[in-house]
Amino acid sequence: GWYAREFDAVGVEFKRRGRIFERNLDLMLRLWTEDSVTLQVDNHNLRQAVLLPKPYQSPHPPVLIGGYVDAVLRRAARMGDGWLTYFYTPEGFTKSWDKVLAYAEEYGRDPSTLSSTNQLAIYVGPSKEEVDPDMRHWLSTEWDVAGWSDSTIEHAICGTPDQCVEQLQAHIETGVDRLVLIPYRYQPEQVELIAREVLPRLTA
């Protein structure tokens, strides 16, 4: 989490968020993979705690760690199965993903075992010029980005099907493993357009 007011609302000290996350992730991984867990850490006191049913995936579901700053990129490389971000341009994504891979090597992990995910807003319409103002208004009023990160509304995929395909191909060429598309205002007709006019034309 990067939004300090969310932590203030629940009485959690913002600067402790990284430590709390790592503690809770370690606990979750143990509950997923061990028959029972006994430990005492901070305000947690578990005695032969059992979590059933165990996850279908073995040893556990993929853990994608999201965030922007180097501390989070290091955490993803050290503790996660991959990195998750949103609203990154191809250039911004590449810069941070290269860091994750380098950190993985630093921690003695095989970088090829990690995956990457970028979430992108998309609006398919008559032309980029026509839909861009509406997309910008939506992203600037109903979404939020960390001003000190590479997350930006400039990432937005919008325009004709041809234009959207061209913009998405630039992301695919970064080597990103997974793109999550967020249709403009979650409109069902946008989902249909993306599925029919855009996705079939993308090439890895």
Locate predicted features:
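Active-site-adjacent structural elements that line small-molecule/cofactor binding pockets in enzymes
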Residues: 1-204
